[in-house]
């Protein structure tokens, strides 16, 4: 009997211990929360710096003299190849603008027709000449129109230096950044014509502080040496054959860059419609005339819809080609010529 009692006690203790173990196990399962944070799996990743164009002034002493000269020519154009040049044979530009009055920050500013990577896009077809064109051809287009001057000889020291500077700017441009530095921001073209009164108000609010109420800009100590802020119309501005004389092109430039120091390609200060109206206002004033513009765009279908001078391959008025509305003209070319126009 005592042996049976002893065995019963032992079994009771055994089952009690087993029961306690099972309870503890279930409690553990229900309350367990695994640590999901990885341990020692992530290694330090070095920070990457976004690509930016090189600053020539920061590496001036180590830069090829030809590139240095190109920089001087585009940033002090009037002094070295314009009215301020030392001798008559060096005077190729007809006004006191600098190339960098439009191609901002030494041609490095995205959204201002930057030169970063531009030489890699040439030769290319240009509708104005209706042929494949070189970078030298494109530069001379600006010389004759925006700079209101004459062509640089293609093999001249000035041309070679300007091209060398442009090539230097894009020499290490990553392929995935090519489009970033191309052209201007795309304008959402308004459905309405330019409102010159609204443009005047916007100009007074946002532009006159730098360019003057009379649009004649602010020159440096010696006017023949260029401008701090360029004139936007009048005898020392771009001529009427320049791309900037087209309302859509001017509006795209304004959208990304003006007011200067406040707007960028990604963060414009003005709305699309405000940029459009002020561009029309600026281009409503007299400026130098470019001879023989009727020969531009031999294939008239390729002429931008906002080109303010004829002839055109349509029956829209000169007034509408200058001030809009442009969507009906764009639609005409889409329906009749299967062409998609953006400017």
Which sequence ranges carry the predicted segments?
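N-terminal export/targeting leaders of redox proteins
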Residues: 1-83, 124-140, 144-157, 170, ...
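Extracytoplasmic/secreted proteins, especially bacterial periplasmic and envelope-associated proteins
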Residues: 65, 69-72, 94, 134, ...
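The canonical Cys-X-X-Cys-His
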Residues: 70, 96-107, 162, 199-218, ...
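Sec/Tat-exported extracytoplasmic proteins
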Residues: 74-81, 103-106, 142-150, 166-173, ...
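Gly/Gly-Pro-rich "capping" loops immediately C-terminal to redox-active cysteine motifs
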Residues: 83-136, 217-259
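Short acidic alpha-helical/loop segments enriched in Asp/Glu that coordinate divalent cations
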Residues: 177-181, 213-226, 264-266, 293-295
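Active-site/pore-lining binding-face segments in mid-to-C-terminal subdomains
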Residues: 234-299
